[in-house]
Amino acid sequence: MNNHPATLRNESSFNYWKSRIQNHDKFDEIFELTTDRQRCTPDEVKNNSLWSQYMFCKPFAPTTLKSYKSRFIKLIYCLIDDEYLNNYYDTHTLNKEFNSIVQQQPLIKPEELCRRMLELRSVTKETLQLTINFYTNTMNLPEYKIPKQVMLPRDKEIKNIKNNEKNIVLREIINTILDCIEKKIKHLSSEFVHDRGLIRGAIVFCIMLGTGMRINRSRHLSVDDLNTLIKRGKLRQAIGLKRKKHRTSNSLNSIKQKPLELAREIYIKNPNILNISKNTSTPFKDFKRLLKEANVEMDRPRSNMIRHYLSSNLYNNGMPLQKVARLMNHESSASTRHYLNKYDVGVDESDDNDEDDDDDENDDRIIDENPSGANISNYDINNSSSGNSSSNNTSGNDFNNNISSGDDADLLSFN
């Protein structure tokens, strides 16, 4: 084994120490202290004898705490001296590292932390900077910025992947996945544990494609929600999802019935399949497994490629950038421009009559409309023949009193 310092910090070593760090008797207490130090409270408030006693600290979101915990564990690991690192039988207690955090007495400089982090694994410049910020806030150190001229190996790798992604034709990928769902996955049963991930992935994928919702919002829809979407073309119902304050409604309007009908068909046979923990990575794992099952090869598969596909088609078919931005709930069109044409969406001139819409990744309101007879040229996304697309039907649904009127939905062109 090579004992050069550059090989001391690796995944095997980290996994061993990660367990010991998390099991330390002071872990929870010091993690809470460290987390609290990430708050940016203005000095004029913090040092004011009157207002400081009334300060209210807004709780961190679960996802933020999850990120902080990951950084905290890596920080403690990087504080361990090299001499103790690979001596697994040593009685090193980690008290030195934890106490340095409490007392704000740095054991290493920020630059050394960078070196040790890069020794552990290849990370992006952004990830490394976030870890450094976490450290300097924790230890009350001056701000440390990685030089602008720096491009780390992981950044170069991602840049190459993004360049390759421009040649990926999303239309072909979507058709391939839908074909796999139609011919194979919809016939599977959740009675077999091994098949459950594929079934979940198929249902959520079809909902995303039919509504433009993000993956974590798609999995919250019920069979009743799908029935309403398919029957009326839209749904207004509070489903307990976070939305921006200026939104006054929580509307879900169906664009394309075919994917939703396919989702419903599978969902009805497996009604409890989406009952999974709220804060879980399961939907993303299911999505990747779905792509693998369909023999779709991508360097960096991401569920939001569907939203890229929808929004790019809206823009390419002539919708003004500002309107696409508004529908995606972006603060500025610059944010939306970042979404557009990152992939080859596979547009052709025969698709100009399609109707569709998209939703923002930070909002749960989907404004999608599927007018009766809308033509979508894609085999698996088109030919909705149910005849239930009328949004004027007001009977036989659990959400009769919550259905939004047609005049509050935008009609969108889509490929």
Curated annotation (Swiss-Prot):
<dbReference type="GO" id="GO:0006310">
    <property type="term" value="P:DNA recombination"/>
</dbReference>
<dbReference type="GO" id="GO:0015074">
    <property type="term" value="P:DNA integration"/>
</dbReference>
<feature type="region of interest" description="Disordered">
    <location>
        <begin position="339"/>
        <end position="415"/>
    </location>
</feature>
<protein>
    <recommendedName>
        <fullName>Very late expression factor 1</fullName>
    </recommendedName>
</protein>
<keyword id="KW-0805">Transcription regulation</keyword>
<dbReference type="InterPro" id="IPR011010">
    <property type="entry name" value="DNA_brk_join_enz"/>
</dbReference>
<dbReference type="InterPro" id="IPR013762">
    <property type="entry name" value="Integrase-like_cat_sf"/>
</dbReference>
<feature type="active site">
    <location>
        <position position="307"/>
    </location>
</feature>
<dbReference type="Pfam" id="PF00589">
    <property type="entry name" value="Phage_integrase"/>
</dbReference>
<feature type="compositionally biased region" description="Acidic residues">
    <location>
        <begin position="346"/>
        <end position="363"/>
    </location>
</feature>
<feature type="active site">
    <location>
        <position position="330"/>
    </location>
</feature>
<feature type="compositionally biased region" description="Low complexity">
    <location>
        <begin position="375"/>
        <end position="404"/>
    </location>
</feature>
<feature type="active site" description="O-(3'-phospho-DNA)-tyrosine intermediate">
    <location>
        <position position="343"/>
    </location>
</feature>
<feature type="active site">
    <location>
        <position position="214"/>
    </location>
</feature>
<keyword id="KW-0233">DNA recombination</keyword>
<keyword id="KW-0804">Transcription</keyword>
<comment type="function">
    <text>Involved in very late gene activation.</text>
</comment>
<dbReference type="GO" id="GO:0003677">
    <property type="term" value="F:DNA binding"/>
</dbReference>
<feature type="domain" description="Tyr recombinase">
    <location>
        <begin position="171"/>
        <end position="357"/>
    </location>
</feature>
<feature type="active site">
    <location>
        <position position="242"/>
    </location>
</feature>
<dbReference type="InterPro" id="IPR002104">
    <property type="entry name" value="Integrase_catalytic"/>
</dbReference>
<comment type="similarity">
    <text>Belongs to the 'phage' integrase family.</text>
</comment>
